Amino acid sequence: MQPYAEMSTEELQELRKQLSAQYKEFQGKDLRLDMSRGKPSVEQLDLSMGMMDVLSSNDDLTCEDGTDCRNYGVLTGIKEAKELIGDMMEVAPDYIIIYGNSSLNVMFDTVSRSMTHGVMGCTPWCKLDKVKFLCPVPGYDRHFAITQYFGIEMINVPMTPDGPDMDMVERLVAEDDSIKGIWCVPKYSNPTGTSYSDETVRRFARLKPAAPDFRIYWDNAYGVHHLYDHDQDHLIEILAECKRAGNPDMVYKFASTSKISFPGSGIAAIATSRNNLEDIEKQLKFQTIGHDKVNQLRHVRYFKDIHGMVEHMRKHADILRPKFEAVIDTLERELGGLGIGTWTKPKGGYFIAFDSLDGCAKAIVARCKKAGLVMTGAGATYPYGKDPHDTNIRIAPSYPPLGDLILAMDLFALCTKIVSIDKILKDRADAQEAPEQA
């Protein structure tokens, strides 16, 4: 197809009329389509319903070490759950704390504890004049919401095909001791689907931060969330790399089963060094006597081991893969060659990142909404909701049924075409006016 930038103004105006007529047809369909969040579909949730049957009133809820899961105790989680999640996180069970149902909650608590009590004896962040976090962009809006809530200044770090711009990360953390952390989704990153390269992970491990309490917040939310059996991204293990590099305490690694079993009813965990674990446990013992051991046991008895979890994730992939491929197919068919957008082609995770022409993302999302399609708000993938170029849109294919998803993507492509034409025509009009004003 001919790039829009090469078409004459008259050709674009005529095409705009045709596209507007198609848009009015969509508006007349009274659509109610939702692609705003990366939620598992009903079909995916049904995959885990057998978990509701693995425990009954007749079952023995005693662990291998004799722990009665019905009672108080076991602050850091039952042994069996640590072994299962340890295999998922590629970390020995001794370096894991099993929490409740939300890894986001664990991350919030970790930042909150650093604010009020400091990290391993360092000054609490609340007593410092300035606290900063590095934020790879585009990134996860709920990460940014945590640091914004605590009044932490956020600094954008551009994402590359290999992960964050490590030249920038290395320079900033080395020269500024007010930088206390960086948010990372290292595998099938939200929203680009990028996985960090081996060299990027090793450069993270070799960081020389000015702040002794600097920590990498390594949210490996999509560690086992592949779309394909053989064509998969692989991530080297960050804690082992940090230990080899002489920085054993520099990483907090987070994960959960939210997009494996039931969102909001899974189990979450943190993996980190022994020093960090001891620091966390000092606070945790005042916060809780122990998390939901019955749910931990339920997960262990359902999945049995990492092999059972991997097989379960293949079923998720069978549902998700056609949806991701439908999105990519629509984008390539409708927008390929037009020069008005680029998009990622992830091998896993839950999102596809789309980048429009400068200054068009908000208008595209707004136009979609007027025709019945709700998407993630433009700008949400940047701190403070401010995309400096207004280009990035997060596409979440997981929740809608396939037929609705295809319809939604047809509408999205149509809105992208209309907004892009308007942008090109406006730029041309502005360019013509400029010499006259001069």
Regions found by a protein language model. Give the residues of each.
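N-terminal "arm"/small-domain region of PLP-dependent enzymes with the aminotransferase-like
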Residues: 2-76, 80-81, 86-87, 370-373
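Conserved core of the PLP fold type I
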Residues: 61, 67-212, 223-246, 361, ...
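Conserved core segment of the aminotransferase class I/II
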Residues: 99, 240-321, 334, 421
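Walker B catalytic acidic pair
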Residues: 220
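Conserved glycine-rich beta-strand-loop-beta hairpin in the small C-terminal domain of fold type I
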Residues: 314-328, 340-355, 369
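Conserved PLP-binding active-site segment of the aspartate aminotransferase-like
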Residues: 353-359, 375-417
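Short amphipathic alpha-helices in soluble, non-transmembrane regions
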Residues: 364-370, 408-413
